[in-house]
Amino acid sequence: MIQPQTLLKVADNSGAKEIMCIRVLGGSKRKFGNISDVIVASVKSATPGGVVKKGEVVKAVIVRSAKGLRRADGSYIKFDENAAVIIKDDKQPRGTRIFGPVARELRDKEFNKILSLAPEVL
């Protein structure tokens, strides 16, 4: 469950290391986001020479959540950390590599490029 002020690890090589959620997109009363939801975030720490800089406001999609997610078959998927991938406006990732596993639920919202770059899809 991701809400404003939540810190997330960045799971790509766009240059950002950590981002903080500013807003969960998808309605004015939306308070929480889960896996495959798009958020607006601020870059809190970044590597030198990266594509994104510290303080930049970016869009990101949540790929891992410590809260977990219930699937249609009744099973749950849960990760050790909260992580996101920084995206462009056309749902394409800004980085060229994805680190760590991502959830299969990204396919429902058509983040196919992220799924193809990920080393493991759970």
From Swiss-Prot:
Recorded family membership: Belongs to the universal ribosomal protein uL14 family.
CC terms in the record's Gene Ontology section: cytosolic large ribosomal subunit
CDD domains: Ribosomal_uL14
Gene Ontology molecular function, alphabetical: large ribosomal subunit rRNA binding; structural constituent of ribosome
Keywords: Ribonucleoprotein, Ribosomal protein, RNA-binding, rRNA-binding
Source species: Clostridium botulinum (strain Eklund 17B / Type B)
UniProt subunit comment: Part of the 50S ribosomal subunit. Forms a cluster with proteins L3 and L19. In the 70S ribosome, L14 and L19 interact and together make contacts with the 16S rRNA in bridges B5 and B8.
Listed name of the protein: Large ribosomal subunit protein uL14
Source superkingdom: Bacteria
PANTHER family: 50S/60S RIBOSOMAL PROTEIN L14/L23, LARGE RIBOSOMAL SUBUNIT PROTEIN UL14M
Primary role: Binds to 23S rRNA. Forms part of two intersubunit bridges in the 70S ribosome.
